C-alpha cells in the first residue's frame, strides 16, 4: 500500500506546483535548448543563407517559475551577405497547461530582439520585455542539423 501512495505522490507532486496562479506581473529567467534541421545555400564564402525548423524545451531558474517546462517549435531563416548577418525566427511555445505563446525573434547588427506576438489562455494580452543571450556554439551532431541554447531574462505583465 505504501508503494502505491508513494507512486501517487511522485506522479501528482509536479502538478501541485502549477496549481498556483501566476503573479500578474514579475520577472522571468529561463534557459532554452533546441535541435533542428536546416537547408543551406552556400553561394560563396561571403554569401550564404539557410532556412530551418527546430524544437526544444525551456527550464526556468529557479524551477517552477513562469515558462518552466515549456516546449516549442520554431521556423526561420538566416543570411550572411558580405559579412552582414540577419535572421528571422517565429516560435510557438506550449506550457504544461496547454496555453500557448507566439514569439518573433530578429537578429541584426549582432543583437537579438524578441517580440511577443500573441498568446492563449493566461498569456492572452501579455506584455514582455527582456534580453536574449546566446549560449554556445555547440557542435552539430549530424550533418544538416544544429543544436543550441539561450538564456532569456526580463519582465512580464499578464492581462
Can you describe what each PLM-predicted range is?
Residues 4-13:
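Sec-dependent N-terminal signal peptides
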Residues 20-159:
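Beta-strand-enriched cores of mature, soluble protein domains
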Residues 15-19:
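Sec/Tat signal peptide C-region and signal peptidase I cleavage site
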Amino acid at each position: 500500500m505504501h508503494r502505491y501512495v508513494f507512486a501517487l505522490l511522485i506522479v501528482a507532486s509536479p502538478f501541485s506546483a502549477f496549481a498556483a496562479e501566476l503573479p500578474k506581473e514579475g520577472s522571468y529567467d529561463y534557459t532554452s535548448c533546441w535541435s533542428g534541421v536546416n537547408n543551406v545555400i552556400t553561394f560563396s564564402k561571403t554569401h550564404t543563407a539557410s532556412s530551418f525548423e527546430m524544437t526544444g524545451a525551456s527550464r526556468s531558474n529557479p524551477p517552477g517559475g513562469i515558462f518552466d517546462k515549456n516546449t516549442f517549435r520554431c521556423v526561420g531563416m538566416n543570411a550572411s551577405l558580405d559579412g552582414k548577418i540577419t535572421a528571422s525566427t517565429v516560435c510557438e511555445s506550449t506550457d504544461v497547461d496547454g496555453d500557448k505563446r507566439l514569439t518573433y525573434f530578429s537578429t541584426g547588427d549582432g543583437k537579438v530582439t524578441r517580440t511577443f506576438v500573441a498568446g492563449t489562455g493566461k498569456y492572452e494580452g501579455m506584455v514582455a520585455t527582456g534580453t536574449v543571450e546566446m549560449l554556445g556554439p555547440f557542435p552539430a551532431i549530424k550533418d544538416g542539423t544544429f543544436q543550441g541554447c539561450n538564456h532569456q531574462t526580463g519582465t512580464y505583465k499578464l492581462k
